[in-house]
């Protein structure tokens, strides 16, 4: 059995500061007026079958050919509220600053209208910034 940890690079104080901020957020108790929401996104290739899979035989799995046809890509937005055990997923055709801003707006307007402030934990992807919100909406 192994345990995995994110080991900061030597001399990277900025990394340690950010990591400690996130760990502090995760240790805070649940508060519905200040929910903790983790958000991420990923693009996925959409593939189709070139040859129909062979039907299942008793005791055997389905046989699927390795050849596939590419049907484009989609972007998956995931929002998780770990202290409540709640999640929400949306799929878009692309990954733009506006798509991210619209996802955040939907989260705030539709799923957390009662919150005073949402504590949002996310990575440093170029679209995940306040600038994206300014580009999508009037300040």
Q: Where are each of the predicted segments found?
A:
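Short, basic/hydrophobic alpha-helical segments
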Residues: 98-119
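Acidic, His- and aromatic-enriched active-site or binding-groove loops in soluble protein domains
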Residues: 12-18
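Helix-centered, glycine/charged polyanion-binding patches within enzymatic domains
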Residues: 125-139
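Conserved short alpha-helical interface segments
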Residues: 1-10, 35, 41-44
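Extended, low-complexity cationic-aromatic segments
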Residues: 19-105
